[in-house]
Structure formats: structure tokens, C-alpha cells
């Protein structure tokens, strides 16, 4: 069941008078009915990629230190972080030094996602299967919760074996399409 204040943790970590990040107060107006996803390249204290899936009025979010990979043999660590507001999917800018997440953010990829099973059940049970239809990422993917210990839940982002999969030796999407 979704929290009654799903963005409380997000808001607690930010001072919206000093950061250009969206506050989440303006609801997103979308008539397509599609669920959006985005991947943001975030040059913070360490470069990483923020993977976000729209669900229940927020963006469920994971920090992926090495970024997504099109090779099904490669599991990329994805650390679950606080939910973000829907309008964050379009955010690009510089978060000021001294603030949570300080650094430059660009939208690296965006598109629509389709859950292949019940997404709420998948998140609860620790295995979310979905399809992406984006500018750089497409096809079937999995988020699989691990037993790794950490302050936040640890998952793996894994590309499924399908027609969109590519060996990392032949094609590294992060190097071939860096921006």
C-alpha cells in the first residue's frame, strides 16, 4: 500500500529555496496514460545514473553506480533511494554544493515502461519485471532485490535476454551514447 506521504523523505533532504530541484507540489498532467521512466546521469560526489519508474504518483528510484548495461550477463548494482516527484523526470540542472546530491544532472534516457507482472507485488517480493521503450534503453528488464547489506535496499538491474540485448564486449551503451 502506498504511503500517505510518499515524498516526505525526498522533501526532508532538500531546501527548495536553494536548489532548483522540483518540489513535487505541482502534479504532472499527462493524457497519454503511459507510465514514464527516466535515467538521469548524475555527476555528484561520484558519477552515477538514477533509474526512475513512475508508479503510484511518484518516481520509484534507484542509484546505479555503473549505469545500465544491455548485456544480460552483467548485473548492475541499483541502490533504492527515496521516491521522487513525477516532475523530476524532466529535471536537468546543477544542484548547489553543500546540498544533498550536489552536482550536475542531465536526462540521459526517457520513455515509457510497462510492468510485466503486478509492479507493487514485484517491489514487495523483490523481483520487478518490466519492458522499457525509450530513446536508449528498450526491451525487457529486471530489478532483483539482493541479500546484500546496506543502509538502503540493494537491487540488481539486469537486462533480459531478448532482441534488444547486446554483449558488453560489442556495445557499451554508456560509452556509445554518453549524453
Please identify what each model-predicted range represents.
Residues 1-179:
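A charge-rich, low-complexity, intrinsically flexible signal that marks solvent-exposed coils, linkers
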Amino acid at each position: 500500500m502506498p504511503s500517505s506521504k510518499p515524498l516526505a523523505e525526498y522533501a526532508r533532504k532538500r531546501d527548495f529555496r536553494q536548489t532548483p530541484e522540483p518540489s513535487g507540489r505541482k502534479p504532472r498532467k499527462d493524457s497519454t496514460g503511459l507510465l514514464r521512466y527516466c535515467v538521469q546521469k548524475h555527476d555528484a560526489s561520484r558519477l552515477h545514473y538514477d533509474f526512475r519508474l513512475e508508479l503510484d504518483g511518484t518516481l520509484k528510484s534507484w542509484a546505479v553506480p555503473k549505469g545500465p548495461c544491455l548485456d544480460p550477463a552483467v548485473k548492475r548494482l541499483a541502490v533504492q533511494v527515496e521516491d521522487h516527484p513525477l516532475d523530476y523526470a524532466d529535471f536537468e540542472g546543477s544542484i548547489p554544493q553543500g546540498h544533498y546530491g550536489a552536482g550536475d544532472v542531465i536526462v540521459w534516457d526517457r520513455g515509457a515502461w510497462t510492468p510485466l507482472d503486478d509492479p507493487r507485488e514485484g517491489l514487495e517480493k523483490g523481483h520487478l519485471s518490466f519492458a522499457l521503450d525509450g530513446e536508449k534503453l528498450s526491451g525487457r528488464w529486471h530489478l532483483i532485490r539482493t541479500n546484500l547489506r546496506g543502509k538502503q535496499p540493494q537491487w540488481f538491474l539486469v537486462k533480459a535476454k531478448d532482441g534488444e540485448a547486446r554483449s558488453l564486449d560489442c556495445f557499451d551503451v554508456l560509452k556509445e551514447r554518453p549524453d
